[in-house]
């Protein structure tokens, strides 16, 4: 891995990570990993032969006001990577400066990405701007999720102040499939029905049969989960007061979708069990 140290300026970390995966006759390999500052990855491993499993490491102290993190992931033709993290991401309270996280993913022909990060926790007073953009080829495959925690509900702490600006985009052959923006500020959580846990799971390509199968699995979550299918993109939403309910539902649906979308049996990362 090529790394460049970054200085911690008074306005925060300026960190970046650029990953490129390529396919070989034996397996997908991490062809290059360039990082600046406290963004890095562990050594890839292969619990299911050719698929590359990779753990991405965020700054150990979390993300604070003034930090800007940029992540770029490139999957060359026929490559397959599953990326997760050993722990939750954290946005801490800020006295004013924004904390930014920009994530861009580029999938070429027949490439497969499973982007399965753990929770992102927003402490009260955080001022966070997040952007996740997926660029797909029509023959590529995507299973991706994000799970936000507003405050620390386990200790009855709410996201009583601060701002969160999040943007989620999916592009297919340079045409937009999904462009979604969410704004939360000043403790007003009415747009999420005052739920502290917000989950989104994306699947491409998907069919009407997959949509109906997912909806059947969401029945037990009452009105706080739903699924839609638009031009082959399956979008599944979750709201919850309980992180275990939300996490379990997302993981169960991922396990259900994986054999249909990428023709592989589920192989949950070991780090999820710790």
From Swiss-Prot:
Keywords attached to this entry: Chaperone, Cytoplasm, Nickel insertion
Gene Ontology CC annotations of this record: cytoplasm
Cellular compartment(s): Cytoplasm
Transmembrane segments: none
Major localisation: cytoplasm
Pfam families cross-referenced by the UniProt entry: UreD
Molecular function via GO: nickel cation binding
HAMAP family linked: UreD
Similarity section: Belongs to the UreD family.
Function: Required for maturation of urease via the functional incorporation of the urease nickel metallocenter.
Binding partners and assembly: UreD, UreF and UreG form a complex that acts as a GTP-hydrolysis-dependent molecular chaperone, activating the urease apoprotein by helping to assemble the nickel containing metallocenter of UreC. The UreE protein probably delivers the nickel.
Protein's name in the database: Urease accessory protein UreD
Encoding gene, per UniProt annotation: ureD
């Amino acid at each position: 891995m090529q790394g460049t140290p970054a200085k911690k300026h008074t306005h925060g970390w300026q960190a970046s990570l650029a990953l490129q995966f390529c396919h070989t006759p034996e397996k997908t390999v991490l062809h290059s990993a360039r990082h600046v500052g406290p963004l890095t990855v562990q050594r890839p491993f292969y619990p299911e032969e050719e698929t590359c499993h990779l753990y991405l490491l965020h700054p150990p102290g979390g993300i604070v006001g003034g930090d800007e993190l940029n992540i770029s992931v490139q999957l060359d033709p026929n490559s397959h990577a599953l990326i997760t993290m050993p722990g939750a991401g954290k946005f801490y309270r800020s006295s004013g400066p924004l904390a930014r996280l920009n994530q861009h993913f580029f999938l070429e022909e027949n490439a497969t990405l499973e982007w399965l990060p753990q929770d992102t926790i927003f402490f009260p007073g955080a001022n966070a701007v997040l952007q996740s953009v997926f660029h797909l080829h029509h023959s590529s495959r995507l299973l991706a999720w994000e799970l936000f925690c507003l405050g620390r509900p386990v200790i009855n702490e709410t996201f009583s102040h601060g701002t969160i600006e999040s943007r989620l985009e999916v592009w297919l052959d340079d045409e937009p499939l999904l462009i979604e923006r969410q704004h939360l500020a000043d403790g007003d959580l009415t747009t999420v029905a005052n739920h502290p846990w917000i989950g989104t799971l994306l699947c491409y390509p998907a069919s009407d049969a997959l949509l109906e199968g997912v909806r059947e699995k969401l029945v037990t979550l009452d009105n706080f989960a739903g699924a839609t299918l638009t031009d082959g993109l399956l979008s599944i939403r979750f709201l919850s007061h309980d992180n275990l309910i939300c996490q379990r539902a997302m993981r169960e649906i991922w396990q259900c979708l994986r054999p249909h979308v990428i023709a592989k049996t589920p192989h949950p990362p070991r780090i999820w069990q710790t």
